[in-house]
Every structure is written in C-alpha cells, then in structure tokens.
Design a protein with these regions (language model features):
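A short acidic, Gly/Pro-enriched loop at the edge of an enzyme's catalytic core
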Residues: 95-102
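Residues lining the SAM
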Residues: 106-108
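Conserved class I S-adenosyl-L-methionine
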Residues: 1-37
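Class I SAM-dependent methyltransferase SAM/SAH-binding core
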Residues: 42, 49-93
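SAM-dependent methyltransferase
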Residues: 137-231
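A short glycine-rich, Lys/Arg-flanked "PGG" loop and its adjoining helix->strand segment in the class I
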Residues: 120-132
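C-terminal lobe and adjacent flexible extensions of AdoMet/dcAdoMet transferase-like proteins
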Residues: 219-274
Length: 274
C-alpha cells in the first residue's frame, strides 16, 4: 500500500508530539530575518497542512503541495475559509502558477528524496519558482538519527481506537531507512471510514471490537551535509546556513535533525515574475 494512504486517516492523532508551533515560530523568525514579512509562500510535503495553516496565521498567503491526495484531503478538511491553495504534486515535479517569496519544507519531507540527482532536481525546481533573493528553508533527519536512534528498532504506539507498530531497518551502505507501519484501526469509529483492499487488510478481534489491519512501507534517505551543500551548488542556488534543530548551533555528530537555509540565485534563462 502506498505511503500516507491509510496512514493519512490517523496521522494527526499519532503525530501529536511534533512541535509544529515551535518550528513555526522559528521559521517565521528566519523569514523575517531575510526581510520576508508577508507575501506568497509554498510548503513542500505539507501533509495535513499543520505548518501551512500556522504560517497562514502569521499573515502569509500559502500554497501547500503534497504527493499524497489522502493527506491533502485531511488538510482541506481543516481549511474553512478557502484561503490556502493545496496542490497534489510530487516535489520533483513542482509546478506553480508564478513565483513565491519563500519555500519551506519540514518534518523530514526532504528525506523522502531518494537520490542525489532527484535532490538536485527539487532544488532546481524551487530555485525556478522563488522570487529574486527568495529563500528555501528545509529540515532533514541526519545519518546519526537513522543509524543510532531509530536503527533497527520496533516501536509501538497504542491509542484508544487505533494502534501502530513501526518496524525500522537502516541500510548502512545506501543510507536508506525503511520502515513498515502496521496499523490496527477500529472499524466502528466513524473517524476511520475508509475503503480498503482485501489483499492489504485483515480483520482482527480484540476485546470484542473489530479492527482492520493495514500495512504501509516508507523509505527515506540520509544525506551528509556536504552532499546537500554540493546539491545546492549544482542546482544553481546559494548556500546560506545549516544548524542543529535543537541547539541552533553548528551541527555535530549528535545532531538528529538539521535546518538548511538556501537562497535563490539567478539562472540563465530563468523567467522571473511568471
């Protein structure tokens, strides 16, 4: 089953530990530091739109893009006034209606880019849609996080009407992290009214209640900081900064998530103000 298909139904419930407000305040501070106090922004890999809505609340006009239509459907459920434009797009095929002041991507969405060439492609796409001097702020999980924190662990998260088992496996040579999600979702809860494929779903009885079991496989890639810097250069962008998410200092061997700030740079043939 494709990543973020069934998981989209319970994503916000199980990701309630993500510090979106803290991240949002920090990103807003960066935007203002670079002179971006208003205007149109785009979030890549916006998921259910939590960060998109936060930035909209800070006075920015927002576009959210995501490869998962199921995640976007959830995002649209939260959107009551229709001010946010959500687009179902693979970030490697980013296509906007014009330029934006800045692009952001959080919650390790960029780790879903599985090859160096695709990383360069995404950066080129972003550069093409940034206004002159615009910035791209994104985070990435580190090699240390995948190899030493998650590694080959198994994690279980049990909630009132659903449970998830995360089975992790990190491939050292390729630096690819694979994880399989096994989800048990109560069928008598109207919040989880989803169609399912009989080949992907199994019924289970627990404490007299009927649960449906689903599986999804996800893969992410860990990059070195030097690889990202090189990709930024190869994409024709300008590298500005990288720092640890928690300390806001230069990353070290214990950093689990890092932020990158890169800036738009002129490309021959680029069409500004589309």
């Amino acid at each position: 089953m494709e990543a973020y298909s069934i998981f989209a139904e319970i994503y916000d419930r199980f990701m309630d530990n993500i510090p979106y407000d803290e991240w949002g305040k920090h990103i807003t501070g960066i935007l203002r530091e670079y002179g971006i106090h208003s205007g149109l922004l785009c979030e890549l890999g916006c998921g259910t739109g939590t960060m998109t809505r936060y930035l909209a609340g800070q006075g920015y006009d927002m576009i959210g893009t995501d490869i998962s239509e199921e995640m976007l459907a959830k995002a649209r459920e939260y959107e009551t006034d229709g001010d946010i434009l959500y687009l179902n797009q693979d970030m490697r095929e980013l296509e906007l209606y014009g330029t934006v002041q800045a692009v952001v991507s959080v919650c390790d969405s960029m780790n879903y880019i599985m090859t160096y060439d695709d990383l360069c492609l995404v950066l080129k796409k972003v550069n093409n849609y940034l206004e002159s001097g615009g910035i791209f702020i994104f985070d990435m999980k580190t090699i240390h996080f995948y190899s030493s924190i998650l590694a080959d662990s198994v994690q279980v998260d049990n909630r009132e009407d659903a449970a998830i088992i995360w089975e992790n496996h990190y491939e050292v040579r390729s630096r690819i992290h694979n994880y399989e999600l096994t989800m048990y979702i109560a069928v008598d809860d109207e919040c989880y009214d989803t169609e399912y494929d009989e080949d992907e779903c199994t019924d289970e009885y627990t404490d007299g209640r009927l649960y449906e079991r689903y599986t999804e496989c996800h893969s992410q890639k860990a990059y070195t900081i030097e690889e990202v810097k090189k990709a930024v250069k190869d994409a024709g962008m300008e590298f500005m900064a990288v720092y640890d998410e928690k300390t806001h200092n230069e990353p070290d061997e214990n950093s689990e998530r890092v932020y990158f700030i890169v800036r738009e740079a002129y490309q021959k043939g680029k069409y500004y103000n589309v």
